[in-house]
Amino acid sequence: MPTIKFIDGTCRVYPGSISVLDILKDVSPNSVQDFMFGCVNGISVDRNAIVTNDSIVKFVYKTDQSTLDIIRYSCICLLGKAVKKLWPSSKIGESDVLENGFFCDIEVDFSFNETSLHLLEACMRQMINKKYKIYTKTFSLKKASTIFKNRNETYKLFLLDRLVNFSNQVVSLCFHEEYIDIQKKISVPNIFLCRNFRLQKFSGVYWKGKRENKVLQRIYGTSWITRIQLEKHLDNVKKLDSRDHRKISKILDLYHIQEDLPGMIFWHRNGWIVFQELKKLIRVKLRKYNYQEVKTPVMMNKKIWKDSGHLDNYKESMFMVCSSNFEYGIKPMNCPGHVQIFNHVVRSYRDLPIRISEFGSCHRNEPSGALHGLMRIRNFTQDDAHIFCREDQICSEVSNCIRMVYEIYKIFGFKKILVRLSTRPKNRIGNDNIWDKAENDLATSLRESKIEFEYQHGEGAFYGPKIELSLFDSLGRVWQCATIQLDFCLPINLKAFYIDHNNERKVPIIVHRAVLGSIERFIGILIEEYIGNFPTWLAPIQVVLANVNSNHLQYIKLLYKEFYALGIRSEIDSRNETISYKIREHIARKIPYIIICGDKEVKNNTITLRTRSGKNFYCIDVQFFISKLCKEINSYSCSLMEE
């Protein structure tokens, strides 16, 4: 007789096993039409999942944003169904949900074009109008393999083989009428819920990202809960085209990515200046909050990754290498290396907290289909820190982390920040007393900082609760960047300890802290937020000195020397072009200030100034300009002079 507890605290007892759907029919029959899936003890389950034991049950409805992923997964299956109907000999490859949509790889014997895309979308809409129900059934891996083998779905067989590494038992398949696919997530109950979708583009990709493999057609699409959300997204896509960091980066000559090295960034001079300026800013804050900056190896012995738990939980995303009969893991994150530094000497409770930071070069084997400019790459730099502290220090350390994050985000002009506190999941280490204190410390730190936040119940990591801070950009997009994470597990796994006041060994708490997250990704966010118009302190070139003719070249060379001595990033444009041509070109390059020097300026020891926003200032005293410019740079101002 399972006792079912609901989110509002009420309970009901049932005589035997019962499905989540039947529970809802009992407690709120009028809500069944909008019911998407359930959560049982914090785990998402299908509507028809059976509950046999005492459980906490939550109902998730179609208006809930958490349904987006399952709508998109179901859209992928719908896309596969339409592909097989239009081109029966085609084969379905990898697919996944992206931040604002989904993709699916297919093998066909022709190259896709716009007509193919329109035909496919029309077919999908016909299927949606049938309003068919989606069913899920569990099979042994052997039986599932037979099903896909009989259908000549060679890529699905490969994906099933990969599942063997994780379960060795059974696999769930979803049935869209005659079409069958691997169930990656819960499906929507009815395909009509996928009606707010649009196929957007296509491209060619190598299977598994390897050039020696077949070229597949990758189809990208987007889907949303409501029509209004879809239309808003499509409108934003148009706006984003002018903000696309990949296009702007070409104009500004920031970086490039090569086809033979996907997900790896080649920083050019201009881009590397932006990168280094961000590091300089973070270093100012690291000094203020008393961090020690370190550097740990890019690869470490496999045993460290095994002991830390990363090999068991993160192996699919790690690059491994062998040398001299040793196996090494290239680091996907910095934390195990920081624990090695903490463990290098015996620590006293008086030494804590110890704050270790690093601009660590990390590598993650991201799927080729998920790679996107600077936003999703395989080699990135984390502005990562780990604070080793006592339990009584958690609250103050977390408060300092929050303060640091807000100070930095304010510099960039981000005003709206979404803060979430993720609490204990069902599967976790540590007792409830530790979790109670940890969650309370995080909540107290947020409240004392006068920060509004929302709970994400059951969404913490198995080793500790966390705070997530997400930025809203000018288009309303949410970027999850900063995290503050408590960790009870890693110090135990890697045998970290300090000597307490009773001269006994005690395990420290680790606070994981990142502000920008991936620096590369943060640069991508800034490019799109500023549309390439970096604040002067961050701009690769802050001032261009342009002469009207050769008579004024000596004067601008003297100005250049003065700027160089002050650390102002400037360059000379002495080309034999008209001054109007030079101005247009440098405005297109988004240079904050263009200095123009002609006869009058040379004679009076002044400058004429043109800002990239189009404002002109005549006969400005050179020292006055330098003073204003240095003040603007040193204060991290987001505005140009007189804006």
UniProtKB/Swiss-Prot annotation:
Subunit note: Homodimer.
Cofactor annotation comment: Binds 1 zinc ion per subunit.
Reaction catalysed by this enzyme: tRNA(Thr) + L-threonine + ATP = L-threonyl-tRNA(Thr) + AMP + diphosphate + H(+)
SUPFAM superfamilies from the UniProt entry: Class II aaRS ABD-related, Class II aaRS and biotin synthetases, ThrRS/AlaRS common domain
Role summary: Catalyzes the attachment of threonine to tRNA(Thr) in a two-step reaction: L-threonine is first activated by ATP to form Thr-AMP and then transferred to the acceptor end of tRNA(Thr). Also edits incorrectly charged L-seryl-tRNA(Thr).
GO molecular function per UniProt: ATP binding; metal ion binding; threonine-tRNA ligase activity; tRNA binding
GO cellular component term, pick one: cytosol
Organism encoding this protein: Buchnera aphidicola subsp. Baizongia pistaciae (strain Bp)
UniProt signal peptide: none
Region span, Catalytic: 244-535
Keywords, alphabetical: Aminoacyl-tRNA synthetase, ATP-binding, Cytoplasm, Ligase, Metal-binding, Nucleotide-binding, Protein biosynthesis, RNA-binding, tRNA-binding, Zinc
Superkingdom per UniProt: Bacteria
Protein name according to UniProt: Threonine--tRNA ligase
